[in-house]
Amino acid sequence: MDFAAIRNAAEAYKPAMVKFLRDMIAIPSESCEEEGVVKRIAEELKALGYDKVEFDKLGNVIGWMGEGDKIIAIDSHIDTVGIGNIENWEADPYKGYETDDIIYGRGGSDQEGGMAAAAYGVKIMKDLDLLPKGYKMMVVGSVQEEDCDGMCWQSIVNEYFNGPEDARSKIEFVISTEPTDGGIYRGHRGRMEIRVDMHGVSCHGSAPERGDNAIHKMAEVILNVRDLNENPADGSTEINGLVKMLDPKFNPEHYEDARFLGRGTCTTSQIFYTSPSRCAVAD
């Protein structure tokens, strides 16, 4: 494989890739509001000469290149989280800016930059006759990943394959274009969302001892979650310290897999509460 030719082709496409990425950044595309950006992606894929460009029932945009019974899939989720308080941004998140080193704006890294790389990467493969024989390249711009991770590919599997087993038999492997600082990561342990509910007894805030404050009870859980993520090996307990998953003493069956993937992480991402009023103990 001529890596110099690949680099030269990428350099030649750089202005077009930059424009494509900045166009995507300029289109607000929070989860469930991706219509504008998926249409822009479809336009680019068609202009690049993809054999087929289509949308599935959920709204994912899919570009196909090459011929064959086996598939190599490249996924980029193209929805973003919100911008929060725009005053906290150093530049308009939907205009952004570019320097010799970065392209700044909402979604530039997570993950519309990956979409630009995937779209042009497969185009370069076609230009240089690097498409593998017997394989189709499946380039996916997936939606609603930020809010409901996995639903986008569940839709694809159900619509284009006869269930998960059929998908596994036809898709040779999947490349995720999540940002990695240019590293190649060969595995992922997956993701889990856990909801924890705490209930208390409300009372007037002037006499909190008469109630049972659900916020205080939840605070203990939140601190334990923090400790679970942050405790070093020598500070781990039977509960706290995810680093223990790497130790055969505590994880004899799966520690080798854990070492390959690296230790897991966890965090608290949302808190909700109910209370009759701001002067009452939360229940």
Name each model-derived stretch.
Residues 2-104, 108, 127-135:
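Acidic/His- and Gly-rich active-site-bordering loop/insert found
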Residues 36, 83-85, 149-151, 185-186:
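Short glycine-/acidic-enriched loop or helix-start segments at secondary-structure transitions
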Residues 55-58, 142, 271:
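Conserved beta-strand termini and adjacent loop/short-helix elements that scaffold enzyme active sites
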Residues 74, 97-150, 194-198, 209-229:
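Alpha-helical metal-binding/catalytic segments enriched in His/Glu/Asp
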Residues 87-95, 152-165, 190-194:
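A glycine- and small-aliphatic-rich helix-loop capping segment at beta-alpha/alpha-beta transitions
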Residues 160-283:
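Midchain, well-structured core segments that form catalytic/ion-binding scaffolds
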